[in-house]
Amino acid sequence: MSKFFKTTLAAFLGTFIALFAVMLLLFSIIGSLSSSISSQESQKVIVAPNSVLKIDFAEMIAEQDAENPLSMISSPGASGKSLGLLKAINSLEIAAQDPSIKFVYMNCDNVNFESLSSLEEFRAALSRFKSSGKAIIAYANNYSAPGYYLASIADKVIMNEYGSANILGLGSNLVFLKDFLDKLGVGIQLIRHGKYKSAGEMYINNNISPANREQNQEMIDAIWDSWVAEIAQSREITVDEFNQLVDNLTLSDAEDMKEHNLVDELMYQNEVEDYICTLTETSKIEDVK
């Protein structure tokens, strides 16, 4: 009888402790949600009339928000933070619907995306913003191929009068580690089927295989063809005309870009700021929200 009561009491205590733990967990979750909602409400931004959404790519746009302190070692001065692609796209969608935001101003000097697919997704989001009837203004001192691909969607593309164009097409750099691993005495046993299964080639080869070269070239060509088609449509030139300019290394400076209708205006940074002030009816750039 004594053993029965002990067993019953132990079961009761165990159940009570479990229920108590569950209740604590529920209260903790409810408290966290309440805190999160309160925090979001307190962080709501009131946008002033005639505001501008400025995009300067100070943080890399990645698939997800992240903070990587090691990036500050490899890239001195970098913040180590990245902005999630979804958050960046949502900001554009909100701006398109907000009557207080007049247009987007985009500085394309340091276009920084984690992947080419993220870059393409963001350009598509800019295109949707443009479809809302609001303008996009793009500026850069110097245009790279990714930077110009993004800028070309803008209603007005501006470039520094003494800027340079580094639009040379696309390429890829592959790393091979066989010699390095051999020196470390590390042997790699790679199991694969088919010559196009090249994910492990970097560990067993010192050079790119013909099959891997073929598939990489196909991928790069497909991406470039897609970019050029979008650029040509935005700038109202033909695909062949743009490819010829790139192939002949015609685009080297701002004058070349202007001559071939790839930029609309040549301005210094302070002139662009004055132009934005005019559009927003403000006296100085510091007053532009």
Each PLM stretch: what is its role?
Residues S2-T238, N243, D247, C277-K289:
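Small-residue-centered hinge/linker elements
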Residues T250-A254:
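Internal gly/pro-rich beta-alpha loop/helix module
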Residues Q269-E271, Y275:
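Amphipathic alpha-helical
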